[in-house]
Amino acid sequence: QNATWKDSMNDNNVMIVTIARSASENGSYNPGTAGVDPTQNLNQTDPLGLSDDERDLINAAVTAKAANGGKVIVLLNNVSAMEVQEIEDNVGVDAILQVGLPGGYGFYGVADILSGAVSPSGHLTDTYAVKNASAPSAQNFGDLQWANANPDISMNDAIVEAENIYIGYKYYETRYFDTVMGQGNAASTVGSSTGSAWNYDDEVTYPFGYGLSYTTFEQTLDNLNVDLENETVTANVTVKNTGSVAGKDVVQLYVSLPYTDYDKEHGVEKAAIQLLDYGKTAELAPGASETVTITADMQNMASWDSTADNAAGTKGCYILDAGDYWFTIGNGAHEAVNNVLAAEGQSVDGSADKAKSWTLDSFDDTTFATTKNGTAVENQLADMDINSWLPGTATYMTRSDWEGTFPKTYKNLTASDEMLDILD
């Protein structure tokens, strides 16, 4: 019998399986089965999920490992977050490395990581969801055309971004936070990939900001200073290499904002956790430490209130609500939000000592009311809201009611005569 590629795996101690997905401008994937070509018989539920051929390749490597020993490593050569829960669940896979289309030169760095010449220190720039199609941002995606517009013109479609600000980790971590806190109908079945009550562990494989290394680190939030006058937040974090391999570590500074009754009444949406800034150590030998100082711009923690009065005499301004602001560090957004929950007394897998609070005594709509050059901020592009043309058409999601406002798909909408004139 002629040897096959599967047989060749028996001759190698380490098997590297590469899974790839390309993407580009106007080259994204429609989520769920809508993005799958049924004629290819790939047995996919999402184009960013595994095909049978990819499963076969991974399983062949795992089978060879079981027979001959060694390791199985899966490389994700992609720019779009894939559905990889089944790889994570495969006990025969020893490691997954997300490399992100590094190109020919970048693969020298990948080889250095695989060989152990360097320790990885990167962190994920997106949430790896179990099912992409369950996300609120996936409900309005693709070519959603007007029902009555001219099909020969180029601008014959519109996407209603009904998910509001809740994209990526700002959705998953905020809904998780509200589920733990028992608020906003967050545990309802709407948006659940399983059809049962929404549960974070059923929805997320790897969180935003998560990363691993060949060594271990301990981070300590030494102190934190909020300087409202100079509009900065400064954190000093001591990082110690507690493992046996030299490596670098990333310090991520997050903030959790107060979500108030004012916000709910005025349509101000806030993520339960958001990245403020980050820094990175030099290479630390085993046992060595370094203090990383992060100075973040406070405007990154201000929220837009489209109903607020402003210095221009119109509407729209950045605000800071009165209340407690929690600052924390962590290996990704999920660890960070758990630190905040722990500090607030919730029974979660978090470290309360890695979170520090700062209290703003009164509502602030003046600190960020003007730009750096003194121009008053105000609402812009209000006519980009479909409701400005077709009142009452769209409902935008709010964390005050996940169940009642989870996005529906807005397709085959009928454009008004005024809109048709503009489109033509």
Identify the meaning behind each predicted range.
Residues 1-424:
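C-terminal non-catalytic regions of proteins with extracellular/luminal or membrane-system context
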